[in-house]
Amino acid sequence: MKLLKGMMSALAVTAGFVMPSYADEPKDQVKVGFIYVGPTGDHGWTYRHDIGRQQVEEKYGDRVETVLESVPEGPDSERVMTDMALKGADLIFTTSFGYMDPTINVAAKFPNVKFEHATGYKQAENVSVYSARFYEGRAVQGHIAGHMTKSNIVGYIGSFPIPEVIRGINSAYIHAKDVNPDVQFKIIWAYTWFDPTKEADAA
């Protein structure tokens, strides 16, 4: 729900820039791009983003057109963002941390396109960032793990050692420690956002 509200807010701001201000003129359609790091069927991060995209379509109807692309983090993502901007996107959601620098680079070339980047820390005149309070869920998980562990050792598989993920680890550890002062966390870095096989091997 928070993700959807963020999308709605961004769309409202974008609409203010691209839609005519005169009531007797027809309103233009806002074109919104979504760039995903994983498949929409992952039942996780990308899946929830795509549910938000679909709800935006339902709410705004023919006032909005959405397009989507799935591309790994890295140089090719910049090409995909550029292509979206060239094809008329007014607002582009770049939905993974590793898209940060490509987002900044492409935004500099397309000052009239608005960008929303997930979980990053770099901004520009036309680049904003968004995130969620993931640490709240990690706090609950840590509390449960602290109660349940019989060895006092809790394994934690982290995606990447970046602020967003580390904040979640800290939250889990603090709340596990609160109920079990002897608890220890063992962190394993997967260095991927979506690789079920690798994540299972790490576990």
Language-model region placement:
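Short, low-complexity disordered leader/linker segments with a strong preference
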Residues: 1-30
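Extracytoplasmic "Venus flytrap"
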Residues: 31-52, 56-60, 67-77, 97, ...
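Second-shell loop/turn segments in exported
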Residues: 38-43, 89, 126-132, 155-163, ...
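An alpha-beta-alpha
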Residues: 53, 140-187
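Structural motif
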Residues: 64-85, 191-203
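Periplasmic-binding protein-like
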Residues: 89-96, 116-118
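Hydrophobic alpha-helical
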Residues: 95-109, 199-203
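Flexible loop/hinge segments that line or gate small-molecule binding clefts
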Residues: 108-132
